[in-house]
């Protein structure tokens, strides 16, 4: 990932010599370059960052698609992730942003959970209630991803605070993976990124609120960023 002032750029190299390149723009910020999303606009935006421009100066477009693709708002959320006789995988029920690359892991956690439901409750009278519980957990997980991503977008132009806030995601991932390795914990019952843990959810909300307060009121940016870092580490102990 390359962090820019109002966006971030991904470069994903595949093993056949093709690299996927894209920009995710923060639409809540004033854009340095406005107008239609065509090749000239892309070149102008990339040209704002010399190191990025050098990386891309000799690239050629592959076919398909053979052209730049543009999408409007990417976030989506269904009101219901499961019902009495059906269920969506998490990535189908909602999508926030690719910043933390949560899509595959989140989907696999849903596959595992649904497989256990089908194995143990296929003919159970409780299946509807259990699927409702699945829905509620998926909504909690998407809310957690949303909060973890949102704080990072708020600090795109403030790298020290971006680093500090990003620690929330890594702590959540490590906690989730450690829980899966614990033989005493049923792995399929654990919510992705600890989303069903009230204490963890309160910690994320507290740090996010502290971030917003600092961004609105700080006069000494570096002093405030250092203070915020210390508060994040203290909250994560």
Where do the PLM segments sit?
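Active-site substrate-recognition segment that forms the wall
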Residues: 1-28, 81, 88-90
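Non-transmembrane, interaction-prone segments in cytosolic or luminal domains
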Residues: 4-9, 16, 39-56, 96, ...
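Short, low-complexity intrinsically disordered segments
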Residues: 6-8, 40, 84, 198, ...
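FAD/FMN-dependent oxidoreductases across multiple families
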Residues: 7, 29-149
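Alpha-helix initiation/capping motif
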Residues: 26, 37-38, 49, 158, ...
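C-terminal helical "tail/cap" subdomain of flavin- and related membrane-associated enzymes
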Residues: 117-237
């Amino acid at each position: 990932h390359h962090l820019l002032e109002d966006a971030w750029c991904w470069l994903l190299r595949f093993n056949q010599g093709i690299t996927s390149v894209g920009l995710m723009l923060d639409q809540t910020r004033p854009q340095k370059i406005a107008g239609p999303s065509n090749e000239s606009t892309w070149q102008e935006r990339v040209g704002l960052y010399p190191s990025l421009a050098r990386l891309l100066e000799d690239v050629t477009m592959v076919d398909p698609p053979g052209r730049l693709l543009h999408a409007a708002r990417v976030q989506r959320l269904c009101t219901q992730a499961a019902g009495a006789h059906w269920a969506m995988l998490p990535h189908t029920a909602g999508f926030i942003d690719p910043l933390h690359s949560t899509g595959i892991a989140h989907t696999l956690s849903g596959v595992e959970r649904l497989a256990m439901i089908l194995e143990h409750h296929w003919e159970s009278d409780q299946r509807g209630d259990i699927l409702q519980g699945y829905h509620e957990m998926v909504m909690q997980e998407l809310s957690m991803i949303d909060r973890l991503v949102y704080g990072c977008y708020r600090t795109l132009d403030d790298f020290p605070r971006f680093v500090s806030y990003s620690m929330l995601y890594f702590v959540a991932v490590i906690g989730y993976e450690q829980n899966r390795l614990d033989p005493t914990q049923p792995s399929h019952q654990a919510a992705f990124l600890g989303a069903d843990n009230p204490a963890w959810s309160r910690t994320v909300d507290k740090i996010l609120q502290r971030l917003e307060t600092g961004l609105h009121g700080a006069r000494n940016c570096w002093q405030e960023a250092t203070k915020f870092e210390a508060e994040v580490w203290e909250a994560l102990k």
